[in-house]
Amino acid sequence: MSELEWDGRLDGDDEYCYRPETTLIVLADTIAKKHGLDPALVCALCEVESAWMPWAARYESGYKWLYIYEFDDEGYPYINLSAGKRERGQQYIKFLIQLGCSGQTEVIHQKISWGLMQIMGATARERGFRGWLTELCDPQVNLEWGCKHLRWMLDHANDYGIEMIGSSPGAFGQHTPPAHTAYQRFDPNLVDLAAAWNGGKVRIVDGKYVNEDYVKRVRKAMEGYQ
């Protein structure tokens, strides 16, 4: 039985709107609290990122921050067979063949954002997930690792600080380099976390988040779970 149920409404250009069953919201609430996170934020991220669809997946071909680890007895035998790793990785190829998968499969799966929270496969690997990345479509697995990463971002916020980019002619992204970039320590709030979840870190240009529209959507969604 599906964890989601269509509520019969259409939103915008024939986009289906789904209403999460109570079980998903309760699960998100429970796991968020386990990691010391605000359940409203986690639920809002699920709503904005995937519309509460556990099977949601998006391939991001331009994503470059892949996580590489080698085979050991406690993990699955994956390796990113990039040019620099091919020679040293030959001993692992037989394991990949036996499983019917390839290094390229792992690369592609790391570039996919998965499930309710749309956590990147590479990010889940970095946080310690060693299962099949397709398991991230399981609601409990997804929420566990999504919340684990969100908690990590909160705990390590000041390792990289908040990026402040000064004004410069033209729209953001059309000037290289920015007129001024500064990093400062900060006390992250829920809105900062939402911005970082979407953009990898908190980036502010001329007083606004670079992903301001996304942040506004999350903030509005949070109101429905408080």
PLM segments and residue spans:
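Catalytic glycan-binding domains that act on GlcNAc-containing polysaccharides
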Residues: E3-Q226
